[in-house]
């Protein structure tokens, strides 16, 4: 058989190398936000977004929005546009002058989401807050089925799991005592919580999160000394009981102190304390300080707020005895925008020489100055993020996974819709670098396969679980990350009922993923379970049932394909088509050679016959 002319090795291998190059490099990171408000809300994009939660247990997060001072509207996620529809409404018009907060949770342990509202009562003469719980029934709320709590609060309460039964409890100072009280979920009984000489700061930024590295949530309090100096207290959970662990002061430079936030800022697997504030009362000079876990030292991670000759700063909180709109303190909202494993933040900044007020992304980047060398990371204001800088008079900005794809998008509230209501803006994150993530939600574990109506309670908003992972990054180094679930609930904390942990551009399996939950009084053993070889770009739903037998806990894994899956498929199909083309060409050339050889044989036969 004669051989035809074969393509060169370079020609054969070129597309294969091209496909591999595409896979290894991936698309270049792009940073842009696309406004999808009309697609999500239609004409209903107004009201104060107050909380997130899955009310109807369909594995999609719903939005809790306050309107007209006293109405709560629940926008249920839907499969068709507009993707969030106002389906459930409860009103406090007969009780309230102004609803101030919304905290979804399962307050009676029936695995159905209930909703706690705090409000200023009508004709209120002081700043005491009333509270009411609307009880969930059949994956919705019954406006007539509610319980008005028999005590009022000095400030918005912290929702936590005080007794470790995974039914949310209500912590705060009430009209009955100057000492913190706890309303236990389930039987709704009042009990003393702690004995302390400190006064609670108003507005507080208490938190229920593990700060002592034992996978059990501790109690963090923002308090005042007898001389009204700001301080912070950590009450450690020891055997299910809270004992004072440490007390520390604010950074000495700060005059205006904002709300504490918690994040694994430097990616070491431990919680760090972030504190925004100002070094003068008018916030002409703003800063963000960080205290690393266990150090007791404040380190500045952002002090540069100038952009092209314009100085920006935080918006100081103005305390009103009888506010007409929801008070919004100086707050950072935390989320990993670019999935690099280092949490970023959203903040509202004001032009110090004008009146413009905007939302800005604070990106977590490697430290480039001497002041933050200890933590190796710092915040950098992203001044020109397309889409975000078009929204004027912003008052709140937070992260939210709009499309349930593991990428955190942005929601901004801005003034000017009406006198009493604000506009909602939703911005899709078009960050195209093919980074990886794992999305974790820990349920209450009050039931497993025996849940009422066979519906797993995906939407109970469980405070207190702690999550940590270890993996190997793209350079072969060990990488850790951690997060607490629903650690803060007051003053528009707007925390998500799940955690999205960025993994960077490493496609390696998570070597270990740990989940810990609170434990009851008297229980010495830590409630913690480990899972290994978790696939990146997956959602892990953890059901800690039964609570006291971690080895029996179950986890459901749902995969979310990334861009690289499509890229791999395209490259593979391209290589296959090219190989088929080569085979076809070789087959055609071989057929031509065979025909030529047959003609030559026939010609030789005729010649011999002559």
From Swiss-Prot:
State any GO CC term. membrane
Annotated keywords: Glycoprotein, Membrane, Repeat, Secreted, Signal, Transmembrane, Transmembrane helix
Q: Which Pfam families match?
A: C2_ITFG1, FG-GAP_3
* UniProt FG-GAP repeat ranges: 98-135, 153-183, 256-291
InterPro entries (alphabetical): FG-GAP (IPR013517), Integrin_alpha_N (IPR028994), Tip (IPR024881)
Gene3D superfamilies registered for this protein in UniProt:
Integrin alpha, N-terminal (2.130.10.130)
Instruction: Tell me where it mainly resides.
Output: secreted
Location of the protein in the cell: Secreted; Membrane
Q: Where is the signal peptide?
A: 1-32
Residues passing through the membrane, by range: 565-585
Q: Which residues are glycosylated?
A: 35, 123, 138, 145, 150, 175, 241, 351, 369, 480
Instruction: Kindly give the membrane topology term recorded for this protein.
Output: Single-pass type I membrane protein
Query: What does the UniProt record say this protein does?
Result: Modulator of T-cell function. Has a protective effect in graft versus host disease model.
Could you describe the subunit structure of this protein?
A: Interacts with RUVBL1, RUVBL2 and alpha-tubulin.
The family line of this record is:
Belongs to the TIP family.
| Protein name, as recorded | T-cell immunomodulatory protein
């Amino acid at each position: 058989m004669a051989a035809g002319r074969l393509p060169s090795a370079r020609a054969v291998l070129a597309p294969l190398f091209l496909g591999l190059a595409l896979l290894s490099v991936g698309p270049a990171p792009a940073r842009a936000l696309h406004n999808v408000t009309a697609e999500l809300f239609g004409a209903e994009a107004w009201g104060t977004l107050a909380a997130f939660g899955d009310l109807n247990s369909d594995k999609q997060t719903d939005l809790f929005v306050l309107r007209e001072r006293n109405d709560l509207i629940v926008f249920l996620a839907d499969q068709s546009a507009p993707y969030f529809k106002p389906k459930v409404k409860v009103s406090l018009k007969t009780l309230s002058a102004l609803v101030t907060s919304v905290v979804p949770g399962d307050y009676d342990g029936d695995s159905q989401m209930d909703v706690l509202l705090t409000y200023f009562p009508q004709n209120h003469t002081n700043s005491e807050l009333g509270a009411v719980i609307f009880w969930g029934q059949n994956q919705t709320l019954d406006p007539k089925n509610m319980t008005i709590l028999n005590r009022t609060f000095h400030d918005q309460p912290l929702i936590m799991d005080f007794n470790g039964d995974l039914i949310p409890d209500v912590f705060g100072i009430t009209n009955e005592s100057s000492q913190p009280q706890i309303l236990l979920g389930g039987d709704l009984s009042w009990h003393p919580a702690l004995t302390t000489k400190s006064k609670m700061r108003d507005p507080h930024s208490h938190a229920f999160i593990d700060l002592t590295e034992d996978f059990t949530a501790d109690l963090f309090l923002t308090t005042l000394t007898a001389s009204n100096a700001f301080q912070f207290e950590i009450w450690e959970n020891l055997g299910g009981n809270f004992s004072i662990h440490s007390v520390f002061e604010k950074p000495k430079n700060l005059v205006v102190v904002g709300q504490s936030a918690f994040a694994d800022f430097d990616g070491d697997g431990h919680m760090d304390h972030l504190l925004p504030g100002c070094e003068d009362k008018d916030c002409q000079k703003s800063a963000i300080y960080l205290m690393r876990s266990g150090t007791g030292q404040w380190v500045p991670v952002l002090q540069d707020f100038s952009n092209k000759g314009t100085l920006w700063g935080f918006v100081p909180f103005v305390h009103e005895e009888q506010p007409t709109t929801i008070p919004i303190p100086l707050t950072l909202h935390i989320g990993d925008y670019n999935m690099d494993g280092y949490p970023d933040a959203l903040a509202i900044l004001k032009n110090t020489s004008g009146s413009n007020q905007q939302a800005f992304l604070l990106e977590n980047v490697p430290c480039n100055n001497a002041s933050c060398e200890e933590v190796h990371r710092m915040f950098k204001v992203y001044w020109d993020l397309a889409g975000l800088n078009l929204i004027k008079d912003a008052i709140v900005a937070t992260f939210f996974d709009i499309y349930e794809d593991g990428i955190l998008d942005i929601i901004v509230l801005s003034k000017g819709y009406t006198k009493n209501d604000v506009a909602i803006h939703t911005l899709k994150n078009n960050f195209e670098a093919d980074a990886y993530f794992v999305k974790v939600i820990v349920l209450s574990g009050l039931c497993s396969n025996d849940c009422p109506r066979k519906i797993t309670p995906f939407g109970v908003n469980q405070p207190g679980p702690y999550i940590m992972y270890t993996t190997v990054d793209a350079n072969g180094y060990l990488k850790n990350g951690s997060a607490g679930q629903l650690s803060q609930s007051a003053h528009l904390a707007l925390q998500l009922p799940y955690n999205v942990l960025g993994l960077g551009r490493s496609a390696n399996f998570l070597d270990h993923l740990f989940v810990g939950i609170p434990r009851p009084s008297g229980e010495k053993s830590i409630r913690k379970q480990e899972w290994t070889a978790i696939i990146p770009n997956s959602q892990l739903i953890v059901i800690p049932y039964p609570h006291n037998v971690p080895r029996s806990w179950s986890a459901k894994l749902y995969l979310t394909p990334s861009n690289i899956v499509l890229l791999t498929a395209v490259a593979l199909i391209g290589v296959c088509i090219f190989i088929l083309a080569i085979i076809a060409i070789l087959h055609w050339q071989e057929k031509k050679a065979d025909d030529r050889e047959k003609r030559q044989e026939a010609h030789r036969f005729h010649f011999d016959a002559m």
